[in-house]
C-alpha cells in the first residue's frame, strides 16, 4: 500500500526517468535518513552520484548515495563491482559513518582492468556507430557474465581461480587484446594479484544478499533501493543501441537483489527540470549553441564519472510519460529547478510530430526518431529561489508562483504528483512539497 506523501513507507525505490544524471544520488541521500538499509541493484562505476553535506562533497560510483546516513548498505547481485575502486569509497564513508554495515553480494561480477581495455577496443570497432561508452568496462563485464566466464566476488580470495578465469577471459577476447598490454602474461598476473589483494580486504563483507535483505526486512528494517542510470539507458526500453548493459527500470529491483517488487511500497521516479545526457544517441529536445553552454554552466553539467560536458535539452513530456509508465512510479522528484529558473524563457516539449502528424508514443528505432518534431509550450523563468526555502517539508505556496505553475503543468500532463523538489546542491535544499 502506498502511503500519502511517502510517510511511513517500509520500502521504497528510487529510479531515473531520463538518461541518468537526474540527481538520484541527492534524492537518495535526502530519503536515506528515514531508512535503515540502502541497496544498489544494478550497474557499476559507470554510475556517478554526488552528495553535498556539511562534511564536504562526496562522489560515489559503487556505494549507494545513502551510505553517509543509513545503518546498512547492500551491493546486490545485479551489480558489477571493481573491488580495487570500492576500497577507497569504503574508507571515505567509514570516516563519516563508522558504524555503517556493508553487505556485498557473493554473486556480483567483478570488473577488471582488462574489461576496461576491451570496452575501449570495442568502441573503436563501432566506428560511426560509437555509443559514447564511459569506458568503465561495464559492458564487457556483463558480456562475460552471460558468457559464463566471469569472475564473481566470491572468487576473489582465491588467487588460482582468479588467474584461471582471467586466462579464460583473455582467450575469449584475444582478438581485441592482442595489441594491448594485456597480451603480456606478466601484466595479466599483476592484475590477478591486485584483484586478490582487494579481495582479501573485502571477503568479510560478502554474503548472499537476497537472504540478507529478506532477513533485514523480516526484522522490520526500512529499506530503500537506489537505481543507477535511467529508463532511456535500459537495453530493452531505452534508445538502443545507445544504452547501458544492465536493466535500469524499477523491475530490476527484483532481478538485481532477489527482493520481490510486490513488497516495494513506493517507487519514486527522479527527473531533472530539463534533460541532460552523456554520450551519443537520440535527444529530441536537445539545445545547442550559447543557450546550451549557459544551461550547462549554470547546472554544472559535466559527468561525475567521465568529466565530459553533458548534452542538455528541454524537458520532454512524451519521454517522461513513457518512463513513468514503464517504472510504474507513485510520485516524481524534480531536480535542478533552481538552474532552469535562471533562464528568461523555459520550454517544455508537450507533443511529438512525425511528418506533421501528432503521435502518442515514443519511437525507439533510429530512423523514426530522426523525424521527430517537438511541439513546445513556453513558461517564464522564475529566477533565483530564496535560501530561506529549505527544510524537509515546505508548503507549495512558499515557492515562486511561476515555478508552481511549471510544477502543476507537469503534474497535469503526466498524471503523477511531484512530491519532492531539489533546488540546490546542499542537503537542506531538497524538500518534500505539502499541497
Curated annotation (Swiss-Prot):
Catalytic residues identified in the record: 21 (proton acceptor), 49 (proton donor)
Superkingdom of origin organism: Archaea
Enzyme category, top tier: ligase
Gene3D superfamilies: Adenylosuccinate Synthetase, subunit A, domain 1, Adenylosuccinate Synthetase, subunit A, domain 2, Adenylosuccinate Synthetase, subunit A, domain 3
Pathway(s) per entry: Purine metabolism; AMP biosynthesis via de novo pathway; AMP from IMP: step 1/2
Annotated localization: Cytoplasm
Cellular-component GO terms for this entry: cytoplasm
Function: Plays an important role in the de novo pathway of purine nucleotide biosynthesis. Catalyzes the first committed step in the biosynthesis of AMP from IMP.
Protein name: Adenylosuccinate synthetase
Protein species of origin: Thermoplasma acidophilum (strain ATCC 25905 / DSM 1728 / JCM 9062 / NBRC 15155 / AMRC-C165)
